[in-house]
């Protein structure tokens, strides 16, 4: 049994021991700036927090995404206030038309606050946008896990299932 790397490298969790090995969150100021970018495009993301819950306020995401979150979804009146009280690991909108996400993804990339992944979604149809802290990715999470466990492999084999795995698969 090996730990799971989750939220595109933002979280590594050992389910066997029920222990978080590491997590990388946004600063509270980054949360505000990222939300401003989403709002400027008329979008409201879901926020994945370090407390294992997902927060949303009238989220712009697919019905399937909300159903998949299930009872871990907490609806709030104000994402700005919520983002100042929690450690946010990931902003997410899944299963939407490309035209809804292309420009916000570019603005997030240009901001220097975030590492957005925009990809064709095979599960929820349409396209999905996940946003990790700057310089955080599935590959950086793998490298961080290797350092955390003092593991020095001669090579690493990875398996991907979505467009947000491409960077990891090219290493």
Predicted regions and their residues:
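Active-site phosphate-binding/coordination module
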Residues: 1-65
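Conserved acidic, metal-coordinating active-site core of Asp-based
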Residues: 37, 41-43, 48-159, 163-168
């Amino acid at each position: 049994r090996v730990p799971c790397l989750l939220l595109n490298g933002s979280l590594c969790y050992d389910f066997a021991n029920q222990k978080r090995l590491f997590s990388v969150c946004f600063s509270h100021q980054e949360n505000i700036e990222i939300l401003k970018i989403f709002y400027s495009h008329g979008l409201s993301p879901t926020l994945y927090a370090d407390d294992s819950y997902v927060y949303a306020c009238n989220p712009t995401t697919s019905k399937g995404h909300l159903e998949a979150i299930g009872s871990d979804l907490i609806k709030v009146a104000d994402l700005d206030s919520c983002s100042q009280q929690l450690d946010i690991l990931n902003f997410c909108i899944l299963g939407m038309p490309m035209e809804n996400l292309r420009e916000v993804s570019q603005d997030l990339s240009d901001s220097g606050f975030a590492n957005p992944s925009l990809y064709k979604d095979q599960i929820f149809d349409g396209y999905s946008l996940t946003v990790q802290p700057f310089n955080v990715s599935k590959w950086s999470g793998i490298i961080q896990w290797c350092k955390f466990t003092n593991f020095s492999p001669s090579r690493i084999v990875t398996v991907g299932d979505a467009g947000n795995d491409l960077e990891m698969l090219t290493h």
